[in-house]
């Protein structure tokens, strides 16, 4: 008989909060470094894996940007995305909406086309190769200037047929959403969907700004929304999805332990929560691992897990393929958890 953990892997789910650069496992990092003649300041894969034991968001971001140096060519980005999609498919992911950080690559002299075309080689073949449908979301770095974000959006112009939406990530505190008002207005005029990280380390007021100023359709993280009852009421009323990342929350010390995570209370309040992996190579788990972690730590029932899976497809940007979304939702409802 399958263990409960095994049962969560085939549970159909969508991943809506995933940074492709955050899927760079040590093995691939060293392989790409060797391919491109890049010297890494780590003796071997084990030493690099040990470096993944960071203490806070900033130390994580420092390592995250440092390792991007191995990503140079279209093939590198294709291999990165394909490796993620294979792992995601093995953990029941049927649809993935993938973030990428072009500013970090442009600053290294890697052109927008290299990044997008490389990623698209993997994403475009993902349905056939892995059974996973995909969308691509361009993220702006909030600790860079709004002018840099606008230049990045302009550089993406030739590739907008590959890009579904825009997002906002990186260090949150001190960089309120309002800083990017004009960029998001420009993205909206281009017909791009809009999401933003808010309420992870930043206050609930950032969530309100993301909704009212940036016009976002989903809140990435949004964990601190629970501190503002009026905001919770609004999120429930407007059915605004929250893309939570439980293992990330623990590693970045947003919560002390998984047992302290407010996910059950958020679901009880009627919030439309989803479970995602964020930067799984760094945070110790992919989508199915996050589902299992909250099951074990929070005692979530099969029906609660089904609700999370259902929410993930309902919150996805699959409006252009409602037939596919309906098929995925039917798979969620048809799934049967093995008896304990």
Swiss-Prot record:
Q: Where is this site: Important for catalytic activity?
A: 221
Query: EC class of this enzyme?
Result: hydrolase
Task: Give the positions the UniProt entry annotates as the active site.
Answer: 200 (proton donor)
Matching InterPro entries: A_deaminase_dom, ADE, Ado/ade_deaminase, Metal_Hydrolase
Catalysed reactions listed for this entry: adenine + H2O + H(+) = hypoxanthine + NH4(+)
Query: How many cofactor units bind, and how?
Result: Binds 1 zinc ion per subunit.
Binding residues for Zn(2+): 17, 19, 197, 278
Q: What is its EC number?
A: 3.5.4.2
| Cofactor requirement | Zn(2+)
User: Per UniProt, where does substrate bind?
Assistant: 279
Q: Please name the GO terms of the biological process aspect recorded for this protein, alphabetically.
A: adenine catabolic process; hypoxanthine salvage; nucleotide metabolic process
Q: Which GO terms describe its molecular function?
A: adenine deaminase activity; zinc ion binding
Which UniProt keywords are given for this protein, alphabetically ordered? Answer: Hydrolase, Metal-binding, Nucleotide metabolism, Zinc
Q: Record's CDD domains?
A: ADA (cd01320)
Q: Which NCBIfam families match?
A: aden_deam, PRK09358.1-6
Family under the similarity heading: Belongs to the metallo-dependent hydrolases superfamily. Adenosine and AMP deaminases family. Adenine deaminase type 2 subfamily.
Functional note: Catalyzes the hydrolytic deamination of adenine to hypoxanthine. Plays an important role in the purine salvage pathway and in nitrogen catabolism.
Q: Mind telling me which PANTHER family this protein's record contains? A: ADENINE DEAMINASE
Q: What is this protein called?
A: Adenine deaminase
What is the species of this protein? Streptomyces coelicolor (strain ATCC BAA-471 / A3(2) / M145)
